[in-house]
From Swiss-Prot:
Pfam families: SBP_bac_3. A lipid is attached at residue 20 (S-diacylglycerol cysteine). One of its GO terms (cellular component) is plasma membrane. This is Probable histidine-binding protein. The keyword Signal applies. GO terms for biological process: amino acid transport. SUPFAM superfamilies: Periplasmic binding protein-like II (SSF53850). Keywords: Amino-acid transport, Cell membrane, Lipoprotein, Membrane, Palmitate, Signal, Transport.
Length: 256
């Protein structure tokens, strides 16, 4: 009887341990299946065609590219809207995990953030009223009033013009309105964004174009904290260019 009881207890204990191990394995597998990387992505939704609102929905070149890369890598994206000049502070404070907002990679910005490889190259385009014959080149802007978007490379470009009176705006639409009302003389903006304003405002024309001084638009992450994620997006940018998705976006948003 004693031998039988001992054998029973040994067998029961073995079955119990196996059951526990199976349950633990199933729970781990379930947890792994339910674990999804979530990234809070900051953007300034007033920079058409890269980031803007259409029927109250966030859209644009950057938005579509981020969503495509995220979908292929099982990443959930939570969009966080803010002003352009507030994006890096939001990144540094942990309110967002990355920036996707037509941000140019520069040495100054690299002091506080890391960038992916560039996904788009752009230029500066200068706008004026069609009936303003006094502005023909960049040199004609000396001492003039120039509208720009706050925190952009174009703001730095305008400030470098001799005696220029630079008006920095959180939204370029404000600058366009000021130009149409003769409160400023010109606007300096990213060429693709500027072309959108030209299409919507026939009284405006471009009169000068130049490189923007940056290395191209890139996605930004907090300094030395997201190396693995940066590699995912670098690979995603390459894949988008080889599988045709990138060209689809270029045509969709009428970019060069």
């Amino acid at each position: 009887m004693k031998k039988f009881l001992t054998a029973f207890l040994v067998a029961f204990t073995g079955l119990f341990l196996v059951a526990c191990q199976n349950t633990k394995t199933e729970n781990n597998a379930s947890n792994e299946a339910n674990t999804t990387l979530t990234l809070k992505v900051g953007t300034a939704p007033n920079y058409k065609p890269f980031n803007f609102k259409q029927d109250s929905k966030l859209t644009g070149f950057d938005t579509d590219l981020i969503e495509e890369i995220a979908k292929k890598n099982g990443i959930e994206i939570v969009w966080v809207e803010t002003n352009f000049d507030g994006l890096i502070p939001a990144l540094k404070s942990g309110k967002i995990d990355m920036i996707a907002s037509a941000m140019s990679a520069t040495d100054e910005r690299r002091q506080s953030v890391d960038f992916t490889k560039p996904y788009y190259m752009s230029k500066n385009l200068y706008l004026k009223l069609k009936n303003n014959d006094s502005l023909q080149t960049k040199n004609d802007l000396e001492g003039k009033k120039i509208g720009v978007q706050l925190g952009t490379l174009q703001e730095n470009t305008a400030k470098a013009i001799k005696n220029a009176q630079v008006q920095s705006n959180k939204d370029l639409n404000i600058a366009v309105l000021a130009l149409k009302n003769n409160k400023i003389d010109a606007i300096v903006a990213d060429q693709d964004t500027a072309k959108g304003f030209l299409a919507e405002n026939p009284e405006l024309v471009s009169f000068y174009q130049e490189t923007d001084g940056g290395e191209g638009f890139s996605f930004a992450f907090d300094k030395n904290k997201q190396k693995d994620i940066i590699e995912i997006f670098n690979k995603g940018i390459d894949e988008a260019k080889t599988d045709g998705f990138y060209d689809t976006l270029i045509k969709k948003y009428e970019l060069e």
